[in-house]
Amino acid sequence: MPFFYQQNINETAHLAIWSIQEPASFFETDVQLAVPIANEERRIQHLAVRLLFKLMMPAADLNQMVMADNGKPYLIGLPFHFSFSHCKGYAACAVDDKPIGIDIEIIHPRIAKVAHKFLNDSEKAMIA
C-alpha cells in the first residue's frame, strides 16, 4: 500500500493520505461498498479511503458505517470522528476524538495563481 503521507497532528488527531495505484480488486478483498458505484475511478477512490480508514482504526466495523443527511459518513455508537476525501488518484482520512475535517484537491496552475487570495501564510508554505 503506497502511503503518500501520514501525520499525527496531536495526541488524538491523525491523518493519512494514500496514492491510489491499485485496481478495485485489491481493495475488495478487505472492504466492500454498501451502495454500488458505477464509475470505476470513483469506486476505487471510495474503496481506497475505506481501507485506509480500516488500517488507521482496525477496531472499527465498517459494516456499521452509515451516511448522515449531509452525506458525511459516521459509525453508529463510536466515540470518535473521522473525515474522508479523495481526488484524482489520492485518498485521505483524518480521525480524532472530536469533530475533524479533511479535503484534498489537485493544485492546478490557474488556481495557484490566485492562491494568495484564499490561503494563509502557513498554507502557502505547504504547497510551495
Q: Where are the predicted features?
A:
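Core catalytic alpha/beta fold that binds nucleotide/phospho-ligands
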Residues: 1-128
